[in-house]
Amino acid sequence: PAPLSVTTPGISRKVITVGCSDDHMEVLVGKNRMVDYSGRGPTMAAVCKPDLVAPGCSVASCASLRDKYTIKSGTSMSTPIVSGAIALLLEKYPDMTNRDVKLRLMETCRDMGLPKNQQGWGLLDVERLLR
């Protein structure tokens, strides 16, 4: 995708915008993989987005049929992974503010060596996040 391809609500400074990594439709950069369909920053206001990336490749998820599962890929799979990690963080540190959470994510993501408009702070590292 082209720069400036992150859309609302992801362009907000207050939103944690999650990109997708590790998919079969990927671009190899060194040893790191970034999907070639995940939106790229910056925003029109020159805000670096996405904030971070998380795995979103071939994730088992609920299907619309009763008692069924399906395999999906994309930021719709990456974002719940980050949300779950944040829930674990807030369980461990319940007094954290939204700013604290964003700062902690920023400090603990693993740099993939990609441009910031593709990876933001880097790849979610749950183990480091919860230390």
Region roles according to the model:
Residues 1-3:
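Short acidic loop-to-helix transition motifs that present clustered carboxylates
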Residues 7-91, 128:
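Extracellular S/T/G-rich loop segment that most often corresponds to the catalytic His/Ser-adjacent loop
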Residues 91-131:
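C-terminal subdomain of the subtilisin-like protease fold in secreted/lumenal serine endopeptidases
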